[in-house]
Amino acid sequence: MELEFKKIKAITKIAKETKVVNFSVKKNENYFANGVLTHNCYMKRHKPEGLSVATNTMDILTEINSHAYFSTVEKPNQTGEYITYDISCNEDFALHAKYHDWKTIFGFFRDHPLAMGSFATKYVNADFFDFNPEGKIRVRFSLMPEKWRKILEPNTSSLDLRLNAVPRFIDAGYEVHLNFSPVIVHDNWLTEYEFLFHLINRHSHFNNWNNDAVKAEVIFLTHNEQKHLYNLEHKLPGEELLWVPKIQETKTSQYGGKNIRYEHNRKADYIKQWTKLHDEHIPWNTIRYIF
């Protein structure tokens, strides 16, 4: 099967002015979101075509500054001493950095006494190596077995490129974590993750990673009915990995959409199996959270 990958040919400015909305979150939560739109990207549930890029950067940073000073967060939790803001929920910031004044954004968090920025990425942007955020930007490299990355994350950096970039980003002044997301359960999934863990260990050994600083976050797959139908309509490969109702259950998202996730009893067992395998091979990679 041949796939047609469309590249951005033009950016059209929308006449309607965008507005900054004051944001808030539930008690005890302190993450905020403003892609490479891969086959499993949740953003395509809401925006099937194209990509939205925020251009009112200074307005957004002003709101973040106000929130950081006047938020109800009483003390830091396990994530660190700063309030953490996700600066790239609706796109892959590293890939689309050319559409942003990224140095201003990174500089804002570098110099802010209370806040730090964070983003997950599937792309190695070498331009970032020339900027030292002094530990105030967290880069979370998304990882899955390479076999499935090629299918589900086309046109993104290979696992070798991502893993080779880890020590370079650390040396440049970034905090770096590994983002195992999404974890997809299928035949031989644990065998493939065992190989991935061996690959990570090999990179960490030969490239002299500061292993204590490289932590993990783990998110098992959640899929969406609208995205499922989109994938089928456009004949995107790999859908048989994502939509497996016999081992999944439905849930209604906060946006009102119909999602599916692994049935909760099965998922509890999957998490135990994955964690056991992870800790056997890369115990130094502390898991911050897994769900």
Q: Language-model segments: which ranges?
A:
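Conserved radical SAM core fold
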Residues: 91-95, 124-127, 139-156, 182-187, ...
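Auxiliary Fe-S-binding modules of radical SAM enzymes
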Residues: 201-291
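Autoprocessing domains of the Hint superfamily
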Residues: 1-40
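Catalytic cores of alpha/beta
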Residues: 188-203
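Glycine-rich S-adenosyl-L-methionine
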Residues: 156-169
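Short, well-ordered coil/turn segments that N-cap beta-strands
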Residues: 79-83, 113-117, 134-137, 172-176, ...
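Conserved Radical SAM active-site core
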Residues: 42-140
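A conserved active-site cap/scaffold subdomain adjacent to cofactor or substrate pockets
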Residues: 166-180, 187
